[in-house]
């Protein structure tokens, strides 16, 4: 998988030595730990290439397989407090009249949408009873139509034959294009903080995008995350806001749009994870963004790909696993009687590290060629990669526990309490990952550089 990532990135700069020592594997019918190690290595290699542009050889990259697998779960270990559950009480898998469906109801408006279709309140037993009378694809369509998030269980073969599955399979792993000439190619930071001075504007939520920007912050980037006034994700904020400042701006208002464009005008990188048509609907399409910041490195993801009938569909890692055949293959291969998902949100995390690699490669291209670039991928395309590598034909892995690695000694002091983090999964020689800011709540910083 690393070869596929590196071929998709194809950045300038000298190639580094990449060391991938053996380790354990997360228990799965798919090569989840291979995906973890390869995606983290792609990001490390992209940084090494960027550093190598300054005239020295590219520094060596080492990725600890067990730590990469663990960072695909949670990196933090709360000291004397607990994280809330990431799942709403209604969220999960339900048997339908002809199969299975997953309802994703963590966001209040998604929960309201699903319950409005089913005509029940939030009692899980009532939801299960109502779902049992529906065909899976009919309920999926009904929930999505009213603005909810749901996915019927499909096999790999069914997804291969679905119009959206075919569209995703035809897309490259990374879609990339050059944009306008940058007024300045940028300069390198100090050897140990190679992204110092790089400004990253973060319009992402939950996991994939925040994983990308967290990594960039760890190498010294100034990351400013922007959320709307009403958004929160308390179960993951302590995990993904490490190293970032977080502000609130309502992009749907004229003042908020102007504020965003002002911030964008001084940014080096924009990472966004809204649905494919969302920024365009706010009057912030790609041409507007490029005009606001010539030479911008514009990096984005969506759930179901950028072409096909579902290109603007709401989606999350767990839903894409249902749609793409991953959860079905897990069920069939293990002899289970219900969908079997991956042991971690692997699509989110792998996509996040690939986005970080794309951002770093975009910075390298701007430094080498003087132009901006636009990069896109999707959770569904990463799922396609994982499926193409193949199922092991049974549950593989030695039972590595993503909670097992011993956390580092330094305590990160947060508003929630003390936190210890497990050691970083990647080492780029001379540029250790470390974060200058602790994780913090959303909306606690001013929307300014």
Regions found by a protein language model. Name each.
Residues 217-252:
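PLP-dependent aminotransferase-like
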Residues 1-230, 261-266, 288-305, 327-334, ...:
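Acyl-CoA thioester-binding alpha/beta core of soluble enzymes
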Residues 205, 251, 275-276, 302-303, ...:
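Short glycine-/small-residue-rich Rossmann-like dinucleotide-binding loops
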């Amino acid at each position: 998988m690393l070869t596929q990532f590196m071929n998709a990135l194809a950045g300038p700069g000298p190639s580094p030595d990449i060391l991938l020592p053996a380790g354990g594997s997360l228990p799965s019918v798919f090569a989840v730990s291979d995906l973890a190690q390869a995606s983290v290595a792609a990001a490390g290699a992209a940084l090494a290439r960027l550093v190598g542009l300054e005239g020295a050889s590219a520094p060596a990259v080492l990725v600890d397989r067990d730590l990469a697998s663990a960072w695909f779960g949670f990196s933090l270990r709360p000291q004397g407090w607990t994280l809330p559950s990431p799942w709403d009480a209604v969220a999960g898998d339900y048997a339908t009249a002809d199969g299975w469906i997953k309802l994703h109801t963590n966001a209040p408006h998604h929960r309201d949408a699903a319950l409005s279709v089913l005509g029940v309140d939030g009692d899980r037993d009532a939801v299960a009873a109502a779902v049992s009378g529906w065909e899976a694809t009919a309920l999926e369509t009904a929930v999505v139509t009213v603005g909810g998030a749901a996915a019927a269980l499909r096999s790999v073969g069914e997804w291969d034959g679905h119009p959206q599955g075919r569209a995703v399979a035809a897309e490259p792993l990374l879609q990339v294009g050059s944009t306008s000439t940058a007024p300045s190619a940028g300069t390198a930071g100090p050897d140990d903080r190679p992204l110092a001075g790089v400004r990253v504007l973060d319009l992402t939520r939950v996991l994939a995008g925040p994983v990308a920007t967290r990594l960039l912050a760890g190498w010294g980037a100034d990351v400013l995350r922007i959320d709307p006034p009403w958004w929160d994700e308390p179960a993951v904020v302590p995990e993904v806001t490490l190293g970032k400042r977080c502000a609130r701006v309502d992009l749907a208002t004229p003042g908020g749009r102007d504020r965003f464009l002002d911030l964008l005008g001084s940014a080096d990188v924009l990472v966004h994870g809204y649905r494919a048509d969302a920024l365009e609907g706010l009057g912030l399409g790609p041409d507007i963004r490029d005009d606001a910041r010539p030479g911008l490195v514009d990096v984005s993801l969506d759930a179901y790909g950028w072409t096909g009938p579902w290109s603007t569909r709401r989606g999350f890692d767990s839903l894409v696993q249902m749609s793409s055949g991953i959860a079905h293959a897990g069920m069939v291969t293990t002899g289970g009687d219900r969908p079997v998902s991956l042991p971690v949100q692997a699509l989110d995390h792998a996509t996040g590290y690939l986005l970080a690699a794309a951002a770093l490669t975009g910075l390298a291209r701007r430094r080498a060629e003087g132009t901006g670039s636009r990069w896109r991928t999707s959770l569904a395309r990463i799922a396609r990669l994982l499926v193409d590598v193949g199922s092991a034909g049974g549950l593989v892995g030695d039972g590595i526990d993503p909670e097992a690695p011993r956390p580092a000694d330094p305590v990160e002091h947060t508003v929630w309490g003390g936190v210890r983090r497990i050691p970083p999964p990647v080492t780029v020689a001379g540029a250790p990952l470390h974060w200058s800011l602790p994780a913090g709540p959303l909306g606690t910083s001013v929307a300014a550089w």
